[in-house]
Amino acid sequence: MILIVVLIAVTSGLFLLNLNYKYWKKRGVPGPKPTFFVGNLADNFLVKKSLSDLYAEIYQKFQDSRLVGIFKANTPVLIIRDPELIKDITVKSFQHFHDNDLFLDKNIDPLLGRNPFFLKGEEWRSTRALLTPGFTSGKMKWVYPSLEEVSRDLVTYIDKHQETTSFKAKELCMRFTLNSVGACAFGLDAKCFEEDNPEFKQIGDRFLVPEGFQAVKAFLIRMIPVLRKMVSFRITPKDVEEKLTNIVRQTLRYREDNNIVRNDFMHILYQMTKTNSDFKEVDATAHAAGFFVEGYETSSVVMHFLLYELAANRRVQLKLRQEIDKAFDENDNTLPYEELQKLVYLDAAFNEALRLHPPVGSLRKVCTKAYTYTPKEDEMIKSFIIEEGMIVILSLYGLHRDPKYFTDPDCFKPERFLDAKKDSFKYVFMPFGEGQRACLGQRFGSLQVKIGVAYIIRNFEISVNGNTQLPIKYDPVYILTLPKEPVWLDFKKIR
Ligand code: HEM
């Protein structure tokens, strides 16, 4: 009897699973054939390819479609290919797609759970409004002297070590961004150029890497989304949470006891704890931690890809050095904030590195209010409803390498950004996202990467070391776009 019940349950389960696989067919939306149980993401489940690589592959296969229907396990998901539709989702119809497909309970992960990236609805809106004043261009000018100091320390650090060894680019850039975030967010010297493994680096090495059991939970939640509400999942390791909380607590106390005012993000948070009774110490800690994790990691990823591309493309490196040298030479061997803003070729090279290697390879939005998809006249699809709760994917990696928008899409050619008319890459080049949910730290991230690279190019000739495995393949597991094997660079002092 039990056997019969189990058989009936399994057969009905299989039947229902297969039934769901007709979801897109019924609506006439094109898409790749799903594999039973895993849907279209088998290569990610088997740790062969990153999700961003997979979405981009699917994006590329369906050249003539505005959207592609796929299955994550047996859940229907939409990949949006059309820039006009992307504009609608991120800007015009934002009220239908205002949340990210990410879930962290702030009672379980109090630091990242309070981060705007993970927050939803009204809570996201009010937190974003609270933090936005910390990222104005005025505030960037405020922290710029700290960034200059850290950049000079970077040059001294490379200088000291380059005789004996070449550098793992990501690690070098991470030391730089950790020091700059330490200075600009916490008002502290993170000592990443002095010690081999200082506390900030230990925290940085572990922050975004869910360990053991948490990684298994993350995988299960991805496969079976209903588990989100049943399984307690955290990204921030417990000991990292304790260390960061202590750093913030001590800094706030020290400032209070000694009446210290510094030009940094912590001062803004400190003021909020004094002026807003709803803003508690745990909020200050969470937002300082948010600045920490978003500030060092994405920027160090971008910076190391930019250095790699400059090392691999000598012509671009030389041209960039001419621009940078001129600015330093005309300003007493310094690079003032206003001068950095004028470096158009540096800006183009930065954008081109972001185009080729966007750290966030895909954006996953959730439909928060049913949305009617209206096809164009030449489409073979009827109008249909994108239901509340459906996940829509914007494949940044797919868009950024689409030959329809970028000629020779796999080549590093900063000139394309110089020649382009304003806004011509809108909604096809969007490394920071678009619309109300776009990256809050874009100004700070761009500033620290550009100043760090400017100081390096001013002082060193860089080349790719033979230890680098080419062509670069992306890590299938890490949540950001990162090479599976490290990029090694050689530095030759020229000044
Ligand atoms: C160059 C480096 C960076 C890149 C490429 C980058 C990219 C992104 C992307 C793609 C998003 C998602 C946008 C969306 O959902 O539409 C995002 C969100 C966010 N980023 Fe960045 N980011 C960078 C640096 C930073 C820095 C330095 C900070 C802060 C110090 C920061 C803070 C945030 C926050 C708070 C969000 C969530 C915004 C929201 O949901 O309202 N980012 N970033």
Model-based region annotation:
Residues P32-E57, P76, F103-F186, P198-R253, ...:
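Cytochrome P450 catalytic-domain helical core, especially the substrate-recognition surface
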Residues A42-D43, K49, E57, T136-G138, ...:
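Conserved cytochrome P450 catalytic core segment spanning the I/J/K helices
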